[in-house]
């Protein structure tokens, strides 16, 4: 069968491209939140660069590796999608649990510096590698489209756009770990649907395709179970050694948001501590409405703007109330 002639498939190429691009955007945005929580917020830009590098590397593989150029398009979509699903799961498990202290990297020449630089390299590799399959699929489909490239490229952009629209609502509702598993599930489903029908394949490949189909179905079912069951089925993300890493019974509530992961930790009754992405956020102090108990704010730096004004303003705008402390100070 010619590489340019597609075997009969269960899913049209435009739909496969739309779905994998949607999953790719969910994966990328999900990892920006995971890495921001695990490491520090500025490593978010590293995720974006590594994702683009992975997609571009997929295109280089297509250009340089002859077996891919000889393979049927649907087979490439199927195998790369299934491989992508497995690589996403494996990558997440490694990234979530690996121990690292990026601050120690700056102690140049020490064992801690080399050890943590190596750990950062592992994280970078697994983020990068999860996007290679997407790059191979996109490069193969668009590179062979000829006169139909406009329609397929539109599907590519539409899928990416839908992924952008869904990323924040899904992160808020499900959390980034499950969003990453949703991306893996989409890849797995596309892989299963893209496998060519046995009727149009040589007999020697029918058994191989059935094995691939069976393994892919197991992966898809496992991922579906994780997505339905929720984040508790996945290992906890181990944060930087320098972060608070509030876990266990001391955590009273945890919630992922579009900006921070917020944990409410027990700071000794009756106070609570807000933890933003594993770093100190602000304290939560009880207040019963009696302003006579707020004398501590008279020497608090947060009262300086009001001391400068002298007379209390009729209206004021507070940006970032820090657990209500600025409100009480006002």
Regions inferred by a protein language model and the residue ranges of each:
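Alpha-helical transmembrane segments of multi-pass membrane proteins
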Residues: 1-330
